[in-house]
Amino acid sequence: MSKDDTILVWFLLHEAWLKNALEFWGFLLDVLGKETSEIKEEVEANAAEVNNAAVLNKEAAEPEAAEIDEAMQPNEETAQIGENQVTTTILATKRAAWARLKAHHKEMEGIHMRDLFAEDPKRFEHFHAQACGLTMDYSKHRIRSGTVDLLTGLARESDLDGWIGRMMSGERINNTEDRAALHAALRYGAPGAFPAGEADVMPGVRDVLGRIRRFADEVQSGTWRGYTGHPIETIVNIGIGGSDLGPVMATRALGAYQHERLTGHFVSNLDATQLMEALNGLDPATTLFIIASKTFTTQETLTNANSARKWFVERAGEDAVAKHFVAVSTALDRTSAFGISPANVFEFWDWVGGRYSLWSAIGLSIATLIGTDNFEELLAGGHDMDEHFRTAPYDKNLPVLMGLLDLWYRDFFGAQSHVVLPYDYALRSFPDYLQQLEMESNGKRVTRDGEAVDYPTGSIIWGGPGNNGQHAFYQLMHQGKTLIPSDFIVPMRCQYSTGEHDDAMLSNALAQTEALMKGKNEKEVRQALIESGMTGKELEAALPHRVLPGNQPSTTLVYEHLTPRILGSLIALYEHKVFTGSVIWGLDAFDQWGVELGKQMAKVIMPELRSPREITDHDSSTNGLINLIRKGRGIS
């Protein structure tokens, strides 16, 4: 586009803005869309950079011609980071599709979902999708079919297909650490090589999986015996972050599949209370510890591991350590120094991020407790969702739809949090697991190439068992002033199914989705109060307290029965939902530099807590707290 053309566009846009002519706005956007398509075709024909256009700067009320000209620059380029080439994108707000969505949001923000259901009696039929044993109802969202078209258009303009291909082919898309994100390879059950670009990772993956199978089978069969010759009865997994959250969630979710002789405990917190509660009443002769730390230097894990080792040695002796401690790590020198035989160390790779690691040897505790056949079914479910994510069209693609809806509310409606509500008690730890997955992945303020974003990214994830939540935080969802999109996760049958329990649980889940959508308006409340016998001032006083505005969006995920395979698909569904958002926001979803600063500061503060001198090296608040604790502990 020439500069004269750009100036002409600016004058037309300025005129349209003053007249508030929405029809002309849409026409102008269509014109720009056609021009940018022509530019893209020309550039592709010349084997140059791909060129997508944007028509508006997100914050500009009256954009200057120069700003429009800038938005028309090529939106994809290749940055050199070390030896790794990473494709980066422009800010999402500079995309033409974003501008269209912004205009569309103005049309949608005042519409109640009651009206959307009234205008389309077959709305469920039009807004649900199925894959991998999951049915996703997204009809209770503040969208029309045109909204989905615009959102999927944004995904295409952001090159989501290309990024899916880069991830699945082993490109080092974690550009800040120059690493691949190949967790999909861990659940690739087909024969032959995983379709990764640089090397076939499957021989190593299959070798570790085989070792996991042999170990878990020995423990479950009673072949693995402790220092007294008794079989193992208790597994204590010591880790933190992804080395804890994933195994905790999966073993609780699949408790119905757990070996009848085995019990599992998980320790992650630096507060010794958690470790002591886990060890209380345990017999060292029948207890096996799994120490999960890639570097074997993680402070929380090593502190707990050393305390557990001390507890064990005091009761069983030093020579018994080798039969009761195994590790998931790559640091053979450190695990050997700890007393763990190299034969009992299970490795994983730097292309396995912590929050994606339950599929790897970090899942050793899962496989040991539920059995390797069930663990491999978990992997197969993840692979099922990988294939769906990779091949399904966007309007039928569960992870893509969930990621786009999340972005729709986060960036256009201003929603800050997202609540996850499993009506399957087995999934009680799933919201905790998703907190790390979503907030650590997309809680970023700069794009892959370090440019500050000018839009919100990531959501605050929270939640808990839905039936319990009804008696706790649902009040805020129904009558508060905050928009809170929600996910209802609903089984047709629970793991320990009884007709009465299941019907009560299902009726509550479905009623809540309807109540959040419809609410109860003033007319309906007034009629109900009159029918109850209330009149006059009493009625008028009660009326505003009984109104529920509704219009709270929700997705409902339904499955027949929670199995290892369904759980695998559900986990991978959310992984790919998160990745979809990261692509459109332009983020590196696989690093987590924000967690490092606090760790570094803790190393400074730890010796200061025992220092004989008054601490003055920090800000007044931190100094005051350190000195308060020193004095309270008798150090002066």
Segments from the language model and where they lie:
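Glycine-rich phosphate-binding loops that contact phosphosugars or nucleotide phosphates
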Residues: R214-G222, T228-A392, V604
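Short helix/loop capping segments that flank catalytic or ligand/cofactor-binding pockets
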Residues: E125-H126, L245-V248, L275-M276, Q299-T301, ...
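C-terminal accessory domains/tails appended to large, multi-domain proteins
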Residues: P549-Q552, T556-W585, F590, L597, ...
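Substrate-recognition/cap regions that form aromatic- and gly/pro-loop-enriched pockets
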Residues: H478, V490-G568, A572, V578
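Active-site phosphate/pyrophosphate-binding segments
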Residues: W311-T498, G519, L548-G550, K599-M606, ...
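Amphipathic, low-complexity, repeat-rich surface-exposed segments
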Residues: M1-E83
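Extended, charge-enriched "interface" segments that sit outside catalytic cores
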Residues: I90-A97, H104, E109-F117, P121-T228, ...
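Hydrophobic alpha-helical scaffolding
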Residues: L91, D137, H141, E198, ...
